[in-house]
Each structure stands twice: as structure tokens, then as C-alpha cells.
Amino acid sequence: MAQPDSSSLAEVLDRVLDKGVVVDVYARLSLVGIEILTVEARVVAASVDTFLHYAEEIAKIEQAELTAGAEAAPTPEA
């Protein structure tokens, strides 16, 4: 019987750092309609190179959205 292929911890860590992982959490605790605790968290695990690559791409997307919004906005007439 063949044993299933298993990955070492180093291989798993290498893949996570290469691809990146984002955990986004929003939780609210209320008791009798009174909000007691709210937790908002975003945890990102990635290598610096991966983070910089994706940050660059996100900046391009945001810039394109701003440019498109500015072109669509009516210009005030004098």
C-alpha cells in the first residue's frame, strides 16, 4: 500500500510565503442588544517580495479607479 505524499513544514512554509495568506476577521459580541465587543482584524502572511508585488498591483488598480472617476465627474462651468 502506497503512503500518501506528505510535505515537510519547510515546504509548506515556503509555499505560504511565496503565495501569501490573508485572514480577514470581523466579530461582534452583544448581550441583550448591547454591543460588548467588536473585533476587526486582517492578518497577512507573505514574503516581502510577494507583498511588494501585490502592493504594486493594488496601487495600479486604485490609480485606474481614481482616473476613471475623475473622467466621469462633471466639470464645473464658469
Curated annotation (Swiss-Prot):
Induction: Synthesizes gas vesicles at all stages of growth in media containing 15-25% NaCl, but not in 13% NaCl. This gene is highly transcribed in all salt levels tested, excpet for very low expression in stationary phase. Longer transcripts able to cover the whole locus are detected at much lower levels. The protein is expressed in both 13% and 20% NaCl (at protein level).
Molecular functions per Gene Ontology: structural molecule activity
Gene Ontology CC entries for this record: gas vesicle shell; vesicle membrane
Keyword Coiled coil attached: no
Main location: other
InterPro entries in the record: Gas-vesicle_GvpA-like (IPR000638), Gas_vesicle_GvpA (IPR047870), GvpA (IPR050530), GvpA-like_CS (IPR018493)
Quaternary data: The gas vesicle shell is 2 nm thick and consists of a single layer of this protein. It forms helical ribs nearly perpendicular to the long axis of the vesicle.
Family membership noted in the UniProt record: Belongs to the gas vesicle GvpA family.
NCBIfam families: halo_gas_GvpA (NF046092), PRK09371.1 (NF006874)
Protein name, per record: Gas vesicle protein A
Species name: Halorubrum vacuolatum (Natronobacterium vacuolatum)
